[in-house]
Amino acid sequence: MRQFTHGTLLAILALANTISAIPSFSANNYPAHPAEPLALFAQSQPQAPLGLWTRLRNSVIERLWGVPPQQRNHRGGNKQYPFYSAPASLQARYSDDVVLRFRLQTADEVKALVEASNILFLDVWASTDEWVDIRLAKDVVPSLLGLLPKSLQTAHVPLIHDLPQTVYESYPSSSQRPTDNGRGFLPSRESSSDVTNIFFEDYQPLSVIGPWMRLLASMFPSHVQLISIGSSFEGRDIPALRVGVRPANDPKPRKTVIIGGGSHAREWIGVSTVNYVAYSLITTYGKSTPISTLLEQFDFIFIPTINPDGYVHTWETDRLWRKNRQETSLPFCPGVDLDRTWGFEWNGNATGDNPCSESYGGDEPFAGTEARQLAGWVKEQTEQHNVKFIAYLDLHSYSQQVLYPYSYSCLPRPPNLENLEELAMGIAKAIRLTNRQSYTVSSACQGFTASQKKVKLDTFPRMESAGGSALDWFYNDVGVKYSYQLKLRDKGSYGFLLPRENIVPTGKEVFNAVMVLGKFLLGSDGFEGLNWEAEFQRLNEADKPILDDGDDDEEEDGQDKNDDSWIPDEYKNDNDHDDDDDGWGLRRRRKR
């Protein structure tokens, strides 16, 4: 039985009472699966009587989640689940859209795609120097292809077969899943290398994340503090967790690391990963010498989402919303891109006076309310609270990249480029060793590495403006020596709609990356004997997401997964099977 005092238990239950007004998961909050018979998920074996701790814990879970943990529907392994079609509201919003991947060969192709995307106001999901993913309406496809050179008119492949269904399945189910071996919502005080908690079995709305953060701060007051970064445009609090053990009366500036996510509202995996890393450090302090040392030497600021308004909007209205929700000069095009509004090398001219652009950085530097709030908080901490920010991890998705400054241009060479690249390589290696996920490493401008003698001046044009990024502002204006943007899973099979089974694996990968960062920051000043590798989190079978291998080419639900009737015949690709074509594997991917 867990070693809790009666006072602690009562305090937890009292806290649960204060937050019992959290909305339950219902259609009022986001699209939910239809109600399912409880018997469908009933246990086949009789259950042993629940112990005192389990009953008390379940009481808290019921108050927090609105449903008993026994009714939670576990989704793992090869178990089959009932199939529910996306509701009419999602069909109406997304059924006419498609996500296309274009393979790039020349700079002229990129330039043509950039110009066409700007003309048609298209939503660029992700881009590398090899491919670009674009979401657009099916009836706009002919117009787009007509603006492109012939080499691109057939160099594309659909990424997601059924966008409304994939959007629908990214929301949590109303039939919650059972806990694993009695584990529940509350953090465990027992030592365990496996972070298993129902909080990470699904993506969570802001109405759950906020109380969860308060609960952590109340349970671990010795090294966790709930703080506020500021307020959003719509008046929501921007909460954060400060994790660390600062020595009393220490005159030296407190070295601090910021780990943030959710600048772009639809990138849910970044939000969940910030929470996962915070939870792992918080619950392991005092049980692990390396982690205890890390939290005694540094403070960590965890900001799950700097864009709470946009995040709420993705749960309540539009799952694929990117920007914040502030007003612009065009009432029908609200929102500013919070990663294009920072004051360093802000390039508002790149999007002109077009608030409808997905990368619109506002009409002036720091036009984005939430970015301005974070910048003000950082300045206040530095000038008034003796804080020195030494590292910044900005979590995004997708494309699996570790990016370092500069983003706005490839021409300036960061003064500590070799160290930036060395640490970035270590981060990518830690991720690869966790689950064999390959992350590329480069400057954010995708220009050059430290091993090159000079900048490549013939790099491809950028698909969108790269000025005004948080990455560059923290590095240049704040003096954060180790500033990175991590673009998390995946490489395009699901894009921003990454299935929930990836939450824990991605969290473990980034936690291990933070361990590498910590080791690097501590250096060799008396910390050589710490066994960092022993703290790495490993994946078990339950963590491994089910990946479509493309071996099943059968039609499902009476639909042809290769239906391309919306593509004009003259633009269709006749090369159905090219082993050297990246798109072939995506075309073969089984429909979800």
UniProtKB/Swiss-Prot annotation:
Residues 170-179 have a biased composition (Polar residues). It is found in: Vacuole; Secreted. Residues 1-21 form the signal peptide. Keywords: Cell wall biogenesis/degradation, Disulfide bond, Glycoprotein, Metal-binding, Secreted, Signal, Vacuole, Zinc. InterPro entries: Peptidase_M14. SUPFAM superfamilies: Zn-dependent exopeptidases. Glycans are attached at residue 349. Zn(2+) binds at residues 264, 267, 396. Inactive carboxypeptidase that may play a role in cell wall organization and biogenesis. This is Inactive metallocarboxypeptidase ECM14. The lineage of its organism: Eukaryota, Fungi, Dikarya, Ascomycota, Pezizomycotina.
